[in-house]
């Protein structure tokens, strides 16, 4: 390939143009082009040319954490218009101007007055301005510049997530990754090695290692065994400056735990065990425990136990307790010391969760031998059967043998056994048992229809040790004998229609028997052979334990005979057979053409109305009694006597009620006007009933006449004289008692009649003493009194 001079010059020119552009933009040092200012003055154009000016400075840096006594020099601002005569004044504004950064307004030197921290603020943005000191006019436009804080290595690496807790399976391969740790450095990663971190392990060797660049922790050994050591503490260091001398460092702790794997088989502590079990141990109960040890933990130590061989395989069983990991030995069948005194079992314990990576460490199971010694125990008697069932016929005589139970002493001593029935307090004792032989007999006559089955409990004990008891249940079934005749299943209401035809079935009947099925059905129905043939009805046995009632003639009449009676016989199928007789009542009723009953005799009518004969009689009696009471009341009203005095000029009685402040007078019944009307009534009312009369009055015989022929005045005078002289008559004028309202008034009662005095005896002069209100009343009565006197 041929390269010409033209092709080489062009790239060089392009690079120079790029450098010049960057230099002028970055450092604000490019010479600004002159700007033409055009003025229009009276049609002429005047052009002014401005001289070229510009800022001159380098990029500013300030070192962080400067602790010197003098302010730290940052840099210098300079304008091309500054001739060094002090006419240019430099002004600094922006972040930290005047507080952190100060400027010499004459020279443009910038100093830092405080210690800065790059980790808090990496740079500051400020503005520079150059003005004429005399006119305060800007010589340069305001320009922005940046002061960067230069980093130093003042921050150590830090582990943000420590300390760490991590696990790794035991027996892991070398180089297995455990954990990656990361440390951070707050220094500037773009400047020097202040933030370049290198990892190393300070503690935990030779078991673990760490990658210096990534911080990944790995296992450094093969087959680390948890059973030998489970916990490890590893210290990791992170150092900046790429691990060089003088670099800052930080550390963290990583706690590593080896998790378990199934790498250990179970082991029995002993190869031979011996266990004592008494022969009285209950079937299903636990008789012993055995345990194999496993160095693993959790599910890796789970195991199951089994009986692999031995002469007690069918007698004992073993199960596993998952919580304690023990083998529980239980009894499957009862033990008998007299038959076998010891057993031998081979028991195996095997892990249930296997890890095939470690199968070469197996087998993961172990076996041991267990010898069981059976202990001799004095046992209660043993019945020959677990339960007994016996039978006896009902109505058997008292003392009938039902059956026999048998119990023996299972021990070698073979002592005698006694029997008794274990009754409850409320049981009715129908049986007893011979204490020596165990024979059960009846003590009462049994009835199968009342109780078909009995359950009793028989107990047996040894003579030498009565406290040892054994029990057995004896069920006694009562067998049936044919001792109950059949009877009708229910009461039948049989109806025959008046328009019935011969051979018509009017009803079907059935029977029941309290005896067992063998002595009950089949039932036979028939008419009594000793009676004459019934001309009206007959009976047909349906041979299915039912019978039909049939008519033997046409038409029945209620007016001639409304009820018929049909005697029948029923026999059962027992041996010997029993029979009974019953009488069927057949009513004659009027029916519709379709056979529906329309009406029967009076009893049927009452039944349809819902009333019985007794209820109807009671209703009729009540009606008769009510009618008799009404008639008697009317008769008494009509027979009442009229009063003797009947006149149009009869005395009128007016009762006037005033405001009475007392309890009423005692003489309210003293005067009765009927005495003037009926003299005989007056004779009854004039005597007092509260006292016995002192003088017996002679009866007065006088002929009564009509009211027109009697002198009323003489009659009244005569009665008044008799009343005044008779001490036994009621007092017509009596003292009235009222509520007490002060001293007794001098005025007397004016509401009663004085039968023994007259108005002339009254003295009304006292009215003048009552006051001026009663003066007129006193004068009025005084004049009347004076007129009477004259």
Swiss-Prot record:
Record domain Cadherin: where: 54-159, 160-268, 269-383, 384-486, 487-608
Signal peptide: 1-24
Membrane-crossing segments per the record: 609-636
Extracellular side: 54-608
Residues modified by glycosylation: 36, 255, 455, 536
Keywords: Calcium, Cell adhesion, Cell membrane, Cleavage on pair of basic residues, Glycoprotein, Membrane, Metal-binding, Phosphoprotein, Repeat, Signal, Transmembrane, Transmembrane helix
A cellular-component GO term for this protein: adherens junction
Positions of the propeptide segment: 25-53
Identification of the protein by name: Cadherin-18
Biological classification of the source: Eukaryota, Metazoa, Chordata, Craniata, Vertebrata
